[in-house]
Amino acid sequence: MDTFITRNFQTTIIQKAKNTMAEFSEDPELQPAMLFNICVHLEVCYVISDMNFLDEEGKTYTALEGQGKEQNLRPQYEVIEGMPRNIAWMVQRSLAQEHGIETPRYLADLFDYKTKRFIEVGITKGLADDYFWKKKEKLGNSMELMIFSYNQDYSLSNESSLDEEGKGRVLSRLTELQAELSLKNLWQVLIGEEDIEKGIDFKLGQTISKLRDISVPAGFSNFEGMRSYIDNIDPKGAIERNLARMSPLVSVTPKKLKWEDLRPIGPHIYNHELPEVPYNAFLLMSDELGLANMTEGKSKKPKTLAKECLEKYSTLRDQTDPILIMKSEKANENFLWKLWRDCVNTISNEETSNELQKTNYAKWATGDGLTYQKIMKEVAIDDETMYQEEPKIPNKCRVAAWVQTEMNLLSTLTSKRALDLPEIGPDVAPMEHVGSERRKYFVNEINYCKASTVMMKYVLFHTSLLNESNASMGKYKVIPITNRVVNEKGESFDMLHGLAVKGQSHLRGDTDVVTVVTFEFSSTDPRVDSGKWPKYTVFRIGSLFVSGREKSVYLYCRVNGTNKIQMKWGMEARRCLLQSMQQMEAIVEQESSIQGYDMTKACFKGDRVNSPKTFSIGTQEGKLVKGSFGKALRVIFTKCLMHYVFGNAQLEGFSAESRRLLLLIQALKDRKGPWVFDLEGMYSGIEECISNNPWVIQSAYWFNEWLGFEKEGSKVLESIDEIMDE
């Protein structure tokens, strides 16, 4: 306890508390709980005094309001507590005589120059009201009362004597002290100022003392050694401790939140002077093109699968005169095309290996030999040319239409399915029957959703990439980007979406990067939305006839990088199914609990009593668009996939920071009247994360739209309330 007091209170407060105890012949070492209580009481008195001031005309100011006017201000409260007893009585009598009031029978803690009243301050572990009436019974009306409880309640005889900020400051400090004490198991040791049962002291016998010393955990020789260690341990760190000491100096003004206080987040996303956010997912999604080859559905090696697909589309395979459509800033288009031809030749040859020769253009593409050279710290200090790199702050971007388009296309139904889920045995219990029914509806919606095909492509590619990275660390390998789909007739097709080249992959740590060059087929002309593709070099490599129409085929090339963590997450991308399934089931369960029977079928298709459930799934021309339960489910699933595909530190930060704002909006909707402080600071934390992540920028755009609808809804409710009041 002694160590705790030293760490959490200023030296002057501790010394005054010890002097007070000495006047009553109490020993601080024998009564540490009493010393703590006096320190808390003193600090609360000083907090109240430091927060409130008067000018020459008697007008009150808080510490924040009085900034810049300090020369004309004086404290509103005189602190009597902490003075030597004889001096305190002399000060109390002088103040009473000076202001023409009666001297109280008991010594006060504070004197209020504005109301000309003495004040008693009380701190309690119990209910503030109970302690208030005990004090009231003793003191009568001779002085005002300010009672604060560790339970976060208070009781004042004069409510106007202390503003909201002052009350909040005192209660926050008490909460902090209680939390610190609880961490060190010292909370129950305290004896408050109120009358509570006191323990009985008794001396431990020799046998009990020995048993106590034997019972301590390994690493401690005796009980006293363990207690000393626990008293001195610092579980929360020096920052929190120093903040606790600074609490009287911190100025926080709570404010009741209104709808008008909320503004859109990330105003820069509407700035047309900024570039559109570019596409930066690892693989193409809605723009992908798969070269299909019918198969019996048997398992094949990736190289065999890719070879068969390329043989079927020989005009694309044998193309030697491409047309350059678009070039990324740092790309060498000649090197990229040579590397593509090497990949095709490696896949097409008769050898079983898919190893690539280490040519100069392959080394350029994979960044071989371009890694930083590590040198000793001592050498760096002596070398004047060595300096710390400036941190790379992401450039701000504006919202782009392609993100919404991707979302729309990925959540649509197609005629093919790639999702491969294991079969489940027959139902035994009634609960299993309900689960199977829900699974059937869920799988029917998700199976033919475009997003599930993209998800499986990511899973298969990252599995192959991680295997090759571990098995062939020093080699360049060609990895086909493949998938397998089944159409509505039950026919299986192998799909080749492109080829990738893996560089050297000596991945010692989980965050060590391996370079991956991707070559992907697409029928999308990049010139239609050039702002989407600055990271890609695009060639036109021929055309295909689809449904009697000729379509150009483009090769999208990109130099990229990944690490073990991202590859492992790619292998686990099926987890997107779980989250969307859980959200669907939560909705069905809620409906079922209201109706009293299983509502799975009713939500999807409707029944005799209920029509199919609908949800708001987007906006069109400023109005909300409704969609079926199945459509909402596909939208949720697609959002989960996008969250994985575009996941990075910006998205993590945005999700965490914006959650607070969402909670505030929910509190406003529930009419709970939330209070906030530093709202602009919260906005700043959110907007710091809105830079160049496409999903974050789109989420901010959607949030702003939703906030607009909620504000409009609140105005309607307010007008209804006014009519009802009239």
Curated annotation (Swiss-Prot):
It is found in: Host cytoplasm; Host nucleus. Keywords: Cap snatching, Endonuclease, Eukaryotic host gene expression shutoff by virus, Eukaryotic host transcription shutoff by virus, Host cytoplasm, Host gene expression shutoff by virus, Host nucleus, Host-virus interaction, Hydrolase, Inhibition of host RNA polymerase II by virus, Manganese, Metal-binding, Nuclease, Phosphoprotein. Mn(2+) 1 binds at residues 41, 109, 120-121. Its EC number is 3.1.-.-. Phosphorylated on serines and threonines by host kinases, including human casein kinase II. It is an enzyme of class 3 (hydrolase). One of its GO terms (cellular component) is host cell nucleus. Pfam families: Flu_PA. Binds 2 manganese ions per subunit. Influenza RNA polymerase is composed of three subunits: PB1, PB2 and PA. Interacts (via C-terminus) with PB1 (via N-terminus). This is Polymerase acidic protein. It comes from Influenza B virus (strain B/Ann Arbor/1/1966 [cold-adapted]).
